[in-house]
UniProtKB/Swiss-Prot annotation:
UniProt gene name: dut
HAMAP family attached to this UniProt entry: dUTPase_bact
Protein name: Deoxyuridine 5'-triphosphate nucleotidohydrolase
Function recorded in the entry: This enzyme is involved in nucleotide metabolism: it produces dUMP, the immediate precursor of thymidine nucleotides and it decreases the intracellular concentration of dUTP so that uracil cannot be incorporated into DNA.
Keyword tRNA processing attached: no
């Protein structure tokens, strides 16, 4: 995979020590943390969503990969802060600012601070099959057309 390009859209990312360019927290980290690029603390009321900029654009280029914005497990478990769209899928050819939909699913207000880590970004491989329109499938699977709850609890 070729290098993924990162464009800094907000100068405070390179000028303010509270902010930083995205890096992996450890050698084993799958992704990078995305920080809230906001000027002042933002109160996210219980049950509401806010669209928060990261101040970054990430251009993958290679169509065999995509970016995924995922919630941070600690924020979700401890504070009920997850993504409004649950998972953000970022196409390889997208060049705009990465925005994060933050949803406070808890019963209490949450204060998001400037430069706070709010989500994570992971690059994943993408299968790009050709699609063939058919009138019947070439064979029958054990599941067939069984839908919701078909293979588990009824």
């Amino acid at each position: 995979m070729q290098a993924v390009q990162v464009k800094v859209l907000n100068p405070k990312i390179t000028e303010d020590k509270a902010f930083s360019l995205p890096t992996r927290a450890t050698d084993g980290s799958a992704g990078i943390d995305l920080r809230a690029c906001i000027d002042e603390p933002l109160t996210i009321k219980a049950g509401t969503t806010h669209l928060i900029g990261t101040g970054l654009a990430i251009y993958i280029q290679d169509p065999n990969f995509a970016g995924m914005i995922l919630p941070r497990s600690g924020l979700g478990h401890k504070h009920g802060i997850v993504l409004g769209n649950l998972v953000g899928l970022i196409d390889a050819d997208y060049q705009g600012e990465l925005m994060v939909s933050i949803w406070n699913r808890s019963l209490e207000d949450f204060v998001l601070n400037p430069a706070e880590r709010m989500a994570q970004y992971v690059v994943v491989p993408v299968a790009r099959p050709e699609f063939e329109v058919v009138t019947e499938f070439s064979d029958t699977s054990a599941r067939g057309a069984g839908g919701f709850g078909h293979s588990g609890r009824q």
